[in-house]
Every structure is written in C-alpha cells, then in structure tokens.
C-alpha cells in the first residue's frame, strides 16, 4: 500500500498506514527502518512513497543502524524518523540517550508487542517504562505521545514532528499492536503546525556559517552539571506547555478510570455504561505519557474516592498515578499482561465491585 492517502476526504486505513502517511504529510525527509511485526507496514509504505517523492529511504541492516542513521540526519536539521517495536526498541536505547544529550529532534514510532525479550506479536503496553523513564544512561527525558484511535495516530504523528523540532528533543509515538493493525476512518488534512527553523544549530554544511559542534561529552563535572540544569529546565517547560489529556465526567466522579492507548477505548465505553446505571464514574486518558498529567490527577484525588488504572501489562502507569495521588485515595489495577485489553464487561464488573467496598 504505497499510494499516498488523500488529504481531502475521510478514508478507511490501518493505524500503521495512518502513521506513515501522516509522517509524509508532516514533511518527513528521511526514513530509516528495519522490519519487525507489528509495525512493518510503516516501513512498507515508506519504501514506496519516500522514493516516489525523492526523499531518503533506507532499509537498514539492523535496528542499531537505523536509529543511528536517524541521529545523523537529524543533526543536519532534517525531519527524520524510524519505527520499531519493543525488543527492537531495546536495541536503540544507547542512541536515544545520545539523542537526548545532543538535543536532536528524532521521531521514533514504537508499536508495542509482548515481552520481555523476544516475547510475541500480541498487543502489549509493556514498554511504558521503557518510553517514559528511558532505557539509556543518564538523566534525560523523552516526549511520549499515546494515540488511542487511528485518527489520533495521524494527529499525534503531526504533533510528534512539531514537538521534536520545537524542543530539540527525542519524541516517541507510543502505540500498541492492536492500534497499529486496527482499521478506522480518518481524515489527514494539512500539516497543522508551523515549521520550526532549525538553521541556528544544525550541521548544514560549513560554508558561510559559524563553526558548530553537536556532542554529548562534557569534559568536567561542572560542565555536565550546567548542561543537565539546562536540559531539565527544558523538560520543565515542556511539562508546563505540552502536558495533554482527555477528561470525561470527573466533576462528580467517585471512581476515575485512568487508561491510555487501545485499553482507553474500552474504559470509555465502560464508563458511559456505568453512568447509565447511576454509578458516578469518570475517566482521564493521558495523551502525553511524558510529561504525565500528574498535577491534574493530584487535583482529582481531592474529590474522587478511588482510581483504577486499566493497562495491558503487569502494572506500569499505575506507579505514576500512585505518585500523583500521593496516598490520598486507593489506586487499583485492572490489567491483562498481554493480548487484548480488559473488556468493557470486565471493567464494568470491577467498577461495580469497587463501588460496593
């Protein structure tokens, strides 16, 4: 499927194809990738479309090669991306740490599958910690965006490119295998963000420009301390300006569901059904996982009686919820370790049970 999907009307497409086409519309100039299920359609789409548009496409020899090619392209100010999944993203952690230190605007699409290790190709959210905390060395953070619909695969791909270049920071679009393979109607439209001028720092050729050096090495402890202070001031700004979430029926809620990605779809349906039953249930869906909407959750903990985290893992986002709630009210976990998310019926039954306590 290499044809460019139309910008002007609604079309039915997979999450992976939606991401790839949105990246093309966003102006992605370079794609470097290595195939792995369940995200291989992204590379498939790019292999045809990027060459058709005379942009750079490389099917790399490994995941390590592909992410380091992205670093090289981004150091010139280019819009560059790669895509991968779980065990393969693990191989990219060193490069992500360097990208954070070098302040390079890389975009990584991570479509999660079962793990740890090779695992399997079923949907999972087991890489929440890997994305939000980081698997490389040092005190760095990445921007992490989490779509829950195929339309959001489009919208957040656009935002990923914009935020990566606006803040010169590695940015991850974190989806799961279910969303990558799901088909829904979407509208692409035009790229909605202003272009960011990367000319002041990029290695754009030596002719007629000042000398520039991009490096992660700091020769002294004092130099590294100052750099880290600068880096974390940027992270603080990102938290203040870019934290995003969807919130429904929380004003009077006794129980608040917190969920991201594909499980949030079932959580939303369950919340609506419980409202029809007279149960005071609300929902908060983080759209940015990093920065996490901790302040808003802390505010809701002043009025809610309980939170339930709905995830496809053994309980990872729940730790961030507990930190935000800070012991004010209980935080419970409803999960599946891997595979399909908890069903609407399971969520409703859990809400009923927790309402009786």
Predicted regions and their residues:
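Thiamine diphosphate
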Residues: 1-134, 141, 149, 337, ...
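Glycine-/acidic-rich phosphate or pyrophosphate-binding loops and their flanking alpha/beta elements
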Residues: 14-18, 232-255, 268, 272
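A general structural motif
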Residues: 120-124, 227-243, 258-266, 286-293
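Conserved thiamine diphosphate
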Residues: 123-176, 343
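Conformationally flexible catalytic loops at phosphate/diphosphate-handling active centers
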Residues: 168-247
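Redox- and metal-dependent alpha/beta enzyme cores, enriched for Fe-S-associated oxidoreductases
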Residues: 247-284, 290-296
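Peripheral docking tails and interdomain loops at the edges
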Residues: 311-357
